[in-house]
Swiss-Prot record:
Component of the photosynthetic reaction center composed of protein subunits L (PufL), M (PufM), H (PuhA) and cytochrome C (PufC). The reaction center interacts with light-harvesting antenna complex LH1. GO terms for biological process: photosynthesis, light reaction. It is found in: Cellular chromatophore membrane. Binds 4 heme groups per subunit. SUPFAM superfamilies: Multiheme cytochromes. Heme 3 binds at residues 267, 278, 281-282. Heme 2 binds at residues 153, 178, 181-182. GO terms for cellular component: plasma membrane light-harvesting complex; plasma membrane-derived chromatophore membrane. InterPro entries: Multihaem_cyt_PRC_cyt_su-like, Multihaem_cyt_sf, Photosyn_RC_cyt_c-su. Its main location: membrane. This is Photosynthetic reaction center cytochrome c subunit. It comes from Roseobacter denitrificans (strain ATCC 33942 / OCh 114) (Erythrobacter sp. (strain OCh 114)).
Amino acid sequence: MFPKWFDKWNADNPTNIFGPAILIGVLGVAVFGAAAIVSIGNPAQTASMQTGPRGTGMHVAEFNVTRFAPDPTIEEYYTEAPYIPEGGEELAKDIYENVQVLGDLTDDNFNRVMTAMTQWIAPEEGCVYCHGEGDLETYGEDNLYTKVVARRMIQMTQNINENWDGHVNANAEVGVNCYTCHRGEHVPSEIWFNITPVTEATAGWASVQNRATPLSQSTSLPSNALEIYLTEYEAVNVHDLESRVAGVPNDVEVASIQKTEMTFSLMNYFSNSLGVNCVFCHNSRAFYDPGQHTPQWATALLGRQMVIEMNQEYLIPLEDEYPEDRLGPVYADAPKAACKTCHKGYQKPMQGLNVIADWPELATTEAPVYE
């Protein structure tokens, strides 16, 4: 078909035509795909929430698929309007034995709250999850750890709603109740335990980082940030305006590189817990300056203080009440809370659903106010 000289030349000079053909094919598909996206639209469209002045990178980008998707746990949320007392009704503390919290409620409202708690925490087991298999005469006994823990969690919930209004109701009345964390589960998701050191072959700082763990958000950052910053009132600030700082790292006034990495680990955890980026709270031009932060920074600061109090005053002291299978895998420590325990990846838990409107009994440590 071809001249002999042409066939001989091809035989003497073999050329791989498949490589260029594949390259041209890939480039052609890429050009076609780009043209289709421009003409039809990006299938993974995003929207940006502006958090500061234009042109400064102050925005939080979200995929519309995520932004418009409802929190699937909202559909299962149980609520019931309170029964307005008419006055003169017998109170729960006078009817039942060993009612240490919620004793000032009427019988109807007391049982209404108890019913809700079973739906929020143990919908399959119901009352027996805390009170056991006995009859009503045995409900006053504290034989099960679940009842002892539930009592303390009611007190914690009341404290949060009453004393941390600046965080839980920062933008509107939202509040918290048992379902905010539990979402129908016996044990809330996104609790955490101490796990450091994460290696046995090293000691010192190397033993708490460079291992992907849930507490490091699967990064090489330190895994002890929650342990340091969410159980103790340790200062988080590590920024210094000096290029060279006189002093010895780990002195009170001198932050070490390790502490800086712990801060990054904590901030990364914050971002993942709320599904946001750094400039949701910080100003892109001056991360270090509270005077230039967004309003969300103050809300987050209060949230951190609130979580520390929750862990110190309510959760960690319950360690002796839990059975072995409820304690941490490394140190047998009590389960602890953090931002994601409530937020579950959303800026607002349950996307801002008001979960306290029907439950004034959980909004205060005093007698509830019915409206």
